Swiss-Prot record:
It comes from Synechococcus sp. (strain RCC307). This is Endoribonuclease YbeY. Disulfide bonds: none annotated. Keywords: Cytoplasm, Endonuclease, Hydrolase, Metal-binding, Nuclease, Ribosome biogenesis, rRNA processing, Zinc. Belongs to the endoribonuclease YbeY family. Its EC number is 3.1.-.-. Zn(2+) binds at H127, H131, H137.
Length: 160
């Protein structure tokens, strides 16, 4: 197994977090370490900083309307910091951005996808993380590749 990447995690709760901060730090660190070989050089690092926020449908609908002109609830939004970010200073973590997850939407989707709320949150967080790292899904092929990578991350998390 790859060593863990150091991570500074800024958690914000506007809703309950079924996993807890320690588990999120462990998961995100593990995922970032697993993804190192696939990252472009500017994103390869030993340490990262990112935000993870859990909110309700009203809060995510407001963000979705403001940033994507779709004023309705969604499951996860990602706000990448690296698109226009300056070169990171040596010795400091690379700021990736923020992931925002709607707990009520995740609660509705979990049974539809045939798994627990915890598994749905892992899936959504991994999706958000991949977006922060530059992955996107403008077409079916790239969506399939991204979902496959998410599945691998989530399955790896289940083994721990």
């Amino acid at each position: 197994m790859n060593p863990l990447a150091a991570i500074e995690l800024d958690l914000a709760y506007l809703g309950p977090d079924p996993l807890g901060e320690d588990r999120w730090v462990e998961l995100l660190s593990s995922w970032l370490a697993q993804l190192q070989a696939e990252l472009p050089s500017p994103l390869k690092a030993d340490a990262y900083s990112l935000g993870l926020q859990f909110c309700d449908d009203a809060a995510i609908a407001e963000l979705n309307g403001q940033w994507r002109q779709q004023p309705k609830p969604t499951d996860v939004l990602s706000f990448a910091a690296q698109e226009d970010a300056p070169e990171p200073l040596e010795g400091l973590p690379i700021e990736l951005g923020d992931i925002v997850i709607s707990i009520p939407t995740a609660e509705r989707q979990a049974p539809e996808h045939g798994h627990s709320l915890q598994q749905e949150l892992l899936f959504l967080a991994s999706h958000g993380l991949l977006h922060l790292l530059g992955w996107d899904h403008p077409d079916e092929a790239s969506l399939a590749a991204m979902l496959s990578r998410q599945d691998a991350l989530v399955q790896g998390a289940a083994a721990h």
